């Protein structure tokens, strides 16, 4: 398959390596800052034109929350299947969904493409369902990533929160960032840390007076996100 990669940072390079190992042909890499990118521009329309001329049969977008909406708008009309790995843009999801329908295009998005993280979602959902019957347990989420990650909390943490809120009846509201020092019982907190080169760690705490149950997923590298 001929693939174009939009966003040629650490994840873009990792995606290229894995794509080639699987017998795919990366025909274009787009990034205004990467010295080894084959097309250097941040202009979404110019990127779309370059991709069309490259003969790409699939597009993988892994850029920045500030760029992803314009990229999607420019790329969908090409009619080429688009996979989006960028997080931090879900406030625009309704607009993007409408555009996808208007252009009769294919767009696939997930907060995290790691097999382990998607298994973790199911574990959290089941644990939250079990613990929901025990009022003595409180719950909170904490996540840590490298100090260059653009969004906070992570898209993965927000997705984990969805599973907790769906399955733990005592939690009905999500709070993150500057949350109150004394949260209400119904509030689910997400705490975020940005430090060093951490690929990604997510922990869900179920805490009571008697004990604490911790569920943690720790990524060892970015490779799991690119598989």
Where is each model-derived feature located?
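Rossmann-fold NAD(P)-binding glycine/threonine-rich loop
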Residues: 77, 85-107, 118-127
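C-terminal substrate-binding/catalytic lobe of Rossmann-fold NAD(P)-dependent oxidoreductases
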Residues: 2-6, 10-50, 133-227
């Amino acid at each position: 398959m001929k693939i174009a990669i939009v966003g040629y940072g650490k994840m873009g390079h990792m995606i290229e390596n894995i794509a080639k190992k699987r017998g795919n042909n990366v025909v274009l890499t787009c990034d205004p800052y990467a010295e080894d990118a084959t097309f250097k521009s941040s202009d979404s329309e110019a990127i779309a034109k370059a991709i069309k001329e490259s003969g790409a049969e699939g597009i993988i977008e892994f850029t920045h929350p500030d760029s992803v909406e314009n990229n999607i708008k420019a790329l969908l009309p090409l009619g080429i299947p688009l996979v989006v790995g960028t997080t931090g843009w879900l406030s625009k999801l309704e607009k993007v969904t409408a555009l996808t329908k208007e252009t009769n295009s294919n767009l696939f998005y997930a907060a995290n493409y790691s097999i382990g993280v998607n298994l973790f979602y199911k574990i959290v959902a089941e644990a939250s369902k079990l613990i929901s019957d025990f009022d003595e347990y409180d719950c909170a989420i904490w996540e840590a990533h490298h100090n260059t990650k653009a969004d906070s909390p992570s898209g993965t943490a927000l997705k984990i929160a969805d599973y907790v809120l769906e399955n733990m009846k005592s939690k009905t509201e999500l709070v993150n960032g500057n949350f109150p020092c004394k949260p209400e019982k119904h509030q689910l907190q997400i705490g975020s840390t940005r430090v060093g080169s951490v690929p990604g760690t997510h922990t869900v705490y179920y805490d009571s007076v008697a004990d604490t149950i911790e569920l943690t997923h720790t990524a060892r590298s970015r490779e799991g996100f690119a598989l």
